[in-house]
Amino acid sequence: GDLFEGQWMTDYRTVSSGYEELLLKPAYRVSASASYRDLSRGLFSHLMIMHHGSESPYKTRRELEDSGLIRLYNDRERSRMRSTMVSGRVNLAIGAIHGGGSLATVYSHTESEAVAEEVAVRYGTDLLTIKGMLNSNITSRLFLLYEMSYNGNRLSLPMADRKPSRLYGMTHALEATYTPVDPLTMTLRGEYYRSRITSDLTKQMVMLDLDLTWSVSRRIDLEAGLHNLLNNDRWDYTTYGLLSRQTVSRQLRGRSLLLTLRLK
């Protein structure tokens, strides 16, 4: 039966200790990794796979009551968690463009259980992160740098009659540094943001920055930075539910000019 015929509460504010400290949770973890490198080609790579799981002899549910957080425990049902993670990274020197690139990714899949409306529900989450970089010294006066990042998540409820939800956010950035004459360096950076906030709402934005540096001497630099050239001053969106509406609005720094005297 239950530990108590009601609520087990040990800390009025956070329930920082309690029933789970009295029990042992069976758990396991298995991992494997491999690396490869070829110095002559400038190739470095690494791959790791890890799988772990645990089992608890009870199910928990959290509820807010007044100013406290209360956990409810039921040891008649067991809960299980399984997770698999794969991560990899590749770095490569590319002589044809006088530069190199890198690609790193992490993927994880987790299956667990939660209590919703007094019913134990199984759910799965997939998380995918990708980061890439490519740089090139096209000439002695022009340097290009491209960076990208992607973060995606997927939530699935096998027991529910609904499609898995997929949300993501990605960023592409291109930076060009040009030195027309030796004392002057110009850097133009463009960024493209795209986010899928809900299944039917996608938000995107472009940002541009320009930086100029004049080397007066070995110890003195004059810098001028013109940021947010397109003057995008807000990142906002509104989502709608059956009986509700939620608006998110974030203030961004508008177009600005920053002058700097740097002493080395």
Where are these predicted regions, by residue range?
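Exposed, low-structure sequence patches enriched in small/polar residues
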Residues: 1-264
